[in-house]
Amino acid sequence: MLKPSVTSAPTADMATLTVVQPLTLDRDVARAIELLEKLQESGEVPVHKLQSLKKVLQSEFCTAIREVYQYMHETITVNGCPEFRARATAKATVAAFAASEGHSHPRVVELPKTDEGLGFNVMGGKEQNSPIYISRIIPGGVAERHGGLKRGDQLLSVNGVSVEGEHHEKAVELLKAAKDSVKLVVRYTPKVLEEMEARFEKLRTARRRQQQQLLIQQQQQQQQQPQQNHMS
C-alpha cells in the first residue's frame, strides 16, 4: 500500500540556500587556477590544454571582465527576489562582455571628486551620432594625476549608469552629480575618436566656408548699395 508523501519543514541547511551570497570572483578564479595546477601535477590532462586555460584566467582580459562584472553587479540595487537577482546578474554579464567587444578591454577607473573638477573633457553623444569620449586630459588635473584615464577612452558608464547611446548632456549631468568620487567604466578606442574628430573638423571647415561666403556676399551687397543710390 502506498504511503502518502510527507513534506518536511525547511531545515536550517535548506534555508541557507535562499541567502544571497556576495560575489567571490577573485577567490573563485584563484581556486580554479589552484585546481588546474593540481591537475597538471597529476598528468591526467594534457599539459598544454591546462596551461592555455590557466593563461586565460590570469590574463588582463579576464581580470578586466571580472572587475567590470563585479562593479556592475554591486552598483545595481538588488532585493531578495530571485527575479531581480537574475536581472542584475544578466545585466552585469552583458555590460562586461559588451564593453569588451571590438578594440580593447574594459577598465574601471575611480577618480576623487574635488572642487577643481575631474580634470578631463568629453565630446560626442547621441545627438552627434557618436559615442561619448574622453577628448582631453587637462594637464595637472585630477585625471592626469591619477593616471587611469586616456584621451580616446570611450565612456561606457558613470557610477553604474550606462551612457552608451545617451546624449552628451546626460553624461555631463552624471559627472556633475557625483559626490566624493566617481567610478567610470571605459575602453580605449583612439581610432574611433580620431575618426569622430576628423568628421567634426570637416563639419567645422564646411561651416567656416559658408560663413566666409556669406560675409563676402554681404560685403558685395554693401559695396553695390552706394553705387545704386548714386545712380538714382
Swiss-Prot record:
Every copy of the PDZ domain together lies at: 108-190
SMART domains per UniProt? L27, PDZ
Task: Provide the L27 domain boundaries.
Answer: 25-80
Chief place of localization: membrane
UniProt keywords (A-Z) are: Cell junction, Cell membrane, Exocytosis, Membrane, Postsynaptic cell membrane, Protein transport, Synapse, Tight junction, Transport
Inducing or repressing factors: Up-regulated by cell depolarization and calcium entry through L-type calcium channels.
What molecular functions are annotated in GO for this chain?
L27 domain binding; PDZ domain binding; protein-macromolecule adaptor activity
Q: Which GO terms describe its cellular component?
A: basolateral plasma membrane; bicellular tight junction; cell-cell junction; membrane; MPP7-DLG1-LIN7 complex; postsynaptic density membrane; presynapse; synapse
Q: Where in the cell is it found?
A: Cell membrane; Basolateral cell membrane; Cell junction; Postsynaptic density membrane
Q: Where is this motif: Kinase interacting site?
A: 14-28
Question: What InterPro entries has UniProt attached to this entry?
Answer: L27_C, L27_dom, L27_dom_sf, LIN7, MAM_complex_regulator, PDZ, PDZ_sf
* Top-rank taxon: Eukaryota
Expression across tissues is: Ubiquitously expressed in brain and detected in lung, liver and testis (at protein level). Expression was detected only in brain.
Record-level GO BP terms: exocytosis; inner ear development; neurotransmitter secretion; protein transport; regulation of synaptic assembly at neuromuscular junction; synaptic vesicle transport
* Membrane topology note: Peripheral membrane protein
Signal sequence region: none
What does the entry note on its domains?
A: The kinase interacting site is required for proper delivery of ERBB2 to the basolateral membrane. The PDZ domain regulates endocytosis and recycling of the receptor at the membrane.
What family is it from?
Answer: Belongs to the lin-7 family.
Q: What does this protein do?
A: Plays a role in establishing and maintaining the asymmetric distribution of channels and receptors at the plasma membrane of polarized cells. Forms membrane-associated multiprotein complexes that may regulate delivery and recycling of proteins to the correct membrane domains. The tripartite complex composed of LIN7 (LIN7A, LIN7B or LIN7C), CASK and APBA1 associates with the motor protein KIF17 to transport vesicles containing N-methyl-D-aspartate (NMDA) receptor subunit NR2B along microtubules.
Give the record's subunit note. Forms a complex with CASK and CASKIN1. Component of the brain-specific heterotrimeric complex (LIN-10-LIN-2-LIN-7 complex) composed of at least APBA1, CASK, and LIN7, which associates with the motor protein KIF17 to transport vesicles along microtubules. Can also interact with other modular proteins containing protein-protein interaction domains like PALS1, PALS2, MPP7, DLG1, DLG2 and DLG3 through its L27 domain. Interacts with DLG4 and GRIN2B as well as CDH1 and CTNNB1, the channels KCNJ12/Kir2.2, KCNJ4/Kir2.3 and probably KCNJ2/Kir2.1 and SLC6A12/BGT-1 via its PDZ domain.
Q: What is this protein called?
A: Protein lin-7 homolog A
Protein species of origin: Rattus norvegicus
Q: Taxonomy-wise, where does this protein's organism fall, top ranks first?
A: Eukaryota, Metazoa, Chordata, Craniata, Vertebrata
Q: Gene symbol?
A: Lin7a
